[in-house]
């Protein structure tokens, strides 16, 4: 079987080479090649493959057909999460709604703010869902709600380099009201309503780009914060303190020097603080980082200007950390919300509802969004929970897997996302 298939492949290779060489020869005769350009070196006759009689080709066709059936065979089992996984959250205070990003099934889900899934129920049905090919929503990870209009700003992180903006009433498979082409790996979003500016963090380029809030299409940013002195390292969440003119950016800790191949390195996770109008290669004013901070994969952040606090969704430790806006260096959080009773599992999204004095957390690890008093600390259970799957159902958190491997020693399947 191997020899026969090899002969077929070789016949294809020879045919391709002949066609390509013929084109190259014609091109050479018509014009000279520039120095360094492709040139025809020589044409050598190749030994022809063994000819097979027609009668001998029937078994080959049968073997190839059988191989095709093998390829079409159904898998023994499939590892797939069929429930929504919440990656970001925002509260539409004016309309009493909680909006959640579902990064697993590519949806934006809108719930009543007081929704509370009973322990016996599998899930809570949303009021509205934005989903489908026309929405340009894929691997949606960042979220902002316009406090006046209720417009929904949805950030895509991976396959679609697009920021989609929808009206508050949008539902189903609808076109966005407008879109903005964003750099690949965009994650966090924040808006300065006073200056009408839109801030986005870019993971792979280690930068923050600032656009007009109403920017669309291919419009370029008005400012870009990037450079070797900036200290960004895989930036994720971003929060603004317009009262003190500060910008807070959460970093995972994957760093590299721009335009220096091979300079990639791991640095401690951090919260970097910059002037609100920082531009170019501006170093941070302060950096919150170190073992006492408990930072581990800090995702989205929220700045509570009224109380002078920064809330951090601490994905790697399944906790919510709260720092003062004046903190610097290796400082302990003023509060930590963590423990089995909290039901917090791999939180990535966070929002502080100042009107109702509540904290809302999006948990990627267990298909839930949990609500607490704003000042909650320790192992405090949620006041309300919105679930998109059965109670206790762990989220697989598989997002655009690039490869797969089997660890024979640990009997584990490993896949990077």
Where are these regions (language model features)?
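Short loop/turn segments immediately following the C-termini of beta-strands
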Residues: 103, 113, 157-158, 203-204, ...
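Short loop/turn segments immediately following beta-strands, especially the blade-tip
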Residues: 112-120, 166-172, 211-218, 273-281, ...
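Short, conserved, GDST-rich strand-edge loop motifs in beta-rich repeat architectures
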Residues: 251-268, 372
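A short beta-strand motif characteristic of beta-propeller blades
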Residues: 74-80, 126-134, 175-180, 221-228, ...
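Blade/loop signatures of beta-propeller domains
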Residues: 32-74, 118-122, 281, 330
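Beta-strand-rich domains and repeat architectures in extracellular enzymes and scaffolds
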Residues: 41-43, 47-52, 78-106
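Beta-rich, blade/repeat-based domains predominating
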Residues: 80-96, 133-149, 181-197, 228-244, ...
């Amino acid at each position: 079987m191997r020899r026969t298939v090899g002969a077929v492949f070789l016949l294809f290779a020879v045919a391709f080479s002949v066609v390509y060489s013929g084109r190259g020869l014609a091109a050479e005769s018509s014009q000279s090649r520039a120095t360094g350009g492709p040139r025809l070196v020589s044409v050598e006759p190749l030994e022809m493959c063994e000819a097979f009689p027609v009668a001998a080709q029937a078994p080959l066709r049968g073997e190839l057909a059988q191989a095709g059936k093998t390829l079409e065979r159904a898998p023994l089992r499939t590892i797939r999460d069929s429930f929504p996984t919440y990656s970001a959250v925002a509260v539409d205070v004016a309309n009493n709604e909680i909006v959640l990003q579902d990064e697993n099934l590519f949806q934006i889900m809108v719930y009543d703010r007081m929704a509370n899934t009973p322990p016996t129920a599998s899930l809570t049905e949303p009021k509205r869902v934005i989903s489908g090919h026309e929405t340009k929503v894929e691997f949606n990870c960042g979220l902002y709600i316009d406090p006046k209009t209720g417009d929904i700003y949805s950030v895509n992180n991976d396959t679609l380099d697009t920021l989609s903006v929808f009206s508050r009433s949008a539902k189903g498979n609808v076109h966005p009201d407008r879109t903005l082409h964003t750099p690949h790996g965009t994650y966090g979003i924040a808006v300065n309503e006073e200056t009408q500016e839109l801030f986005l963090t870019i993971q792979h380029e280690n930068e923050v780009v600032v656009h007009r809030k109403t920017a669309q299409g291919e419009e370029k940013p008005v400012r870009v914060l990037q450079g070797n002195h900036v200290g960004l390292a895989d930036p994720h969440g971003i929060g603004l303190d317009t009262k003190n003119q500060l910008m807070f950016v959460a970093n995972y800790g994957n760093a590299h020097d721009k335009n220096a191949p091979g300079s990639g390195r791991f640095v401690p996770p951090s919260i970097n603080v910059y002037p609100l109008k920082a531009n170019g290669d501006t170093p941070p004013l302060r950096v919150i980082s170190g073992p006492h901070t408990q930072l581990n994969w800090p995702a989205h952040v929220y700045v509570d200007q009224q109380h002078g606090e920064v809330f951090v969704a601490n994905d790697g430790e399944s906790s919510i950390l709260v720092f003062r806006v004046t903190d610097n260096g290796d400082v302990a959080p003023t509060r930590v919300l963590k423990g089995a009773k909290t039901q917090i599992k791999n939180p990535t999204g966070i929002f502080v509802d100042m009107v109702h004095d509540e904290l809302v957390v999006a948990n990627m690890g267990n298909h839930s969004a949990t609500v607490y008093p704003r000042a909650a600390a320790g192992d405090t259970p949620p006041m309300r929970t919105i679930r998109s799957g059965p109670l206790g159902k762990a989220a697989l958190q598989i997002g655009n897997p690039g490869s797969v491997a089997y660890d024979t020693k640990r009997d584990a399947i490993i896949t990077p996302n």
